[in-house]
Amino acid sequence: MSTKFDPEKAENLEEIEKQFAVKAVGHAQTYWQLLEAVPPKSLKLTKIDDEIYDDFLEQFPEYKANPSMVEVIDENVLKSQENKQRWFKFMNAYEKKVQDYTFGSLLRMNVKEDYTEKNTMFVPRMQFYVFEIARNKLGMNDHVYDSAKSSK
């Protein structure tokens, strides 16, 4: 069958959606286990964490001015029409540098809470990296490691 596939006209098949969800949940579980096992400040999510972090603060200075926006992410602000364009431009700069940069990932909205249905949003992998790199550098994920360490 050699028909051309048009992603704009493709239907979201339930099975494909389930596969994406399973993969995203697996990624979240693995990341949580890393946070519990390794001090977050020493955790590297990509080979270019520092570059991503510096570029993020330069392209999105509001997060540098107000780190609480990294701690508790407002999904409406993040996914606003204005910010969609900014994020699209930012993420595309990493197309050849970060593997699976557009793949869907689960991101906790409030860093102080676990992955739950109410505290999770679906974002491109690059946004996950940006916020979790920032959270790790700012010590916002330390509580996960400290809690796991003290319960052993």
Outline where the language-model segments fall:
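Nuclease and nuclease-like effector domains acting on nucleic acids or nucleotide cofactors
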Residues: 1-96, 132-152
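Short loop/turn segments at secondary-structure transitions that flank enzyme active sites
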Residues: 112, 126-131
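Short coil/turn segments at secondary-structure boundaries
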Residues: 118-121, 127, 135-139
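Histidine-centered nuclease catalytic patch
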Residues: 85-122
